[in-house]
Structure formats: C-alpha cells, structure tokens
Amino acid sequence: MTQSQYSQTPRLALTDAIIDAKARKNLTFEDIAQGTGLSLAFVTAALLGQHPLPADAARVVVDRLELEEDAFFLLQTIPVRGSIPGGIPTDPTIYRFYEMVQVYGSTLKALVHEQFGDGIISAIDFKLDIKKVDDPNGGSRAVITLDGKYLPTKPF
C-alpha cells in the first residue's frame, strides 16, 4: 500500500544520507539514476525528497549507495513536497488549494454571507470527500466536497 509522509523531516534526513553517500562514493546523480528506468531529473528530485520512487528504482538506489534498508521503504513514500520553507505552501497539491482560496475566497465569503448570514463554516463539525470521476473531454477530474456546519455569529 502506498504510504504518505506528513512531515518533511524523515525525507530531509534521508536526503542528507543520500548526499553524503553520493559524495563518499564520488557518484553523480546520473550514476545513481542508471538502471532505475526513470529520467535523471525525476530520480534527482526523488533523491532530494520531492517524489516517491517505485520499488524497483528504490532498490537500485539503496543498493548503489549502500543505504540502510529503511531507506528502501522511505524512498517509496509520497513526500511532503516543497524544498523552500515559508508561509506560502510549496507542495503543488497543497498550493493549488491555496490558489483556489486566493481566487475564490472572496466569492465563497460573499455567497456564504448572502445565503446564510454573518457567520462561518466550521472546520470542526466537518466532512471532506474526494472522488475521482471521468472527464468527458478525457482524463480525470477531482470532485472535492467540503461539508461544514454553518455557525452564525452571535451578538453579545
């Protein structure tokens, strides 16, 4: 089963070990990527903590760099992407949600207030659903439902 990271910390530590082994063995990223069946750019990004590797590619990397066996499993996990810390999310998936709120946040606020009155949509009494559906024009679409309880502002 595919596993996902919730923190950059494990992958950052693994990246440090990879860079150390790469230097000790005097290898290039191209040397490490050979035999993985993946592009140099993808493998390099994965080694820097930005992508998961398929099991066969992870095995090649771990064996070539003589990494601990835990690295084999960690290289296959979906990382928290983004290598530049800051206030704005850098993970592409998370950033798209940030972008959506930047573009549609004021619209959502206006429509919530118009339809419900002064208040908020709860993120505590909340349900989230995501479905993958076919796009009639080809490919897939994500249908994301955010179902939060409306909480009116109470004068005091």
From Swiss-Prot:
Protein EC: 4.2.1.104
Which biological process annotations from GO are given for this protein? Answer: cyanate metabolic process
Which residues catalyse the reaction? 96, 99, 122
Q: What class of enzyme is it?
A: lyase
Looking up SMART domains in the UniProt record yields: Cyanate_lyase (SM01116)
InterPro entries assigned to the protein according to its UniProt record, in alphabetical order: Cyanase, Cyanate_lyase_C, Cyanate_lyase_C_sf, CYNS_N, Lambda_DNA-bd_dom_sf
| UniProt KW keywords | Lyase
Q: Has keyword Lyase?
A: yes
GO molecular function list: cyanate hydratase activity; DNA binding
- Organism's domain of life? Bacteria
Listed under catalytic activity are: cyanate + hydrogencarbonate + 3 H(+) = NH4(+) + 2 CO2
What family does this chain come from, according to its entry? Belongs to the cyanase family.
Q: What does this protein do?
A: Catalyzes the reaction of cyanate with bicarbonate to produce ammonia and carbon dioxide.
The entry's protein name is Cyanate hydratase
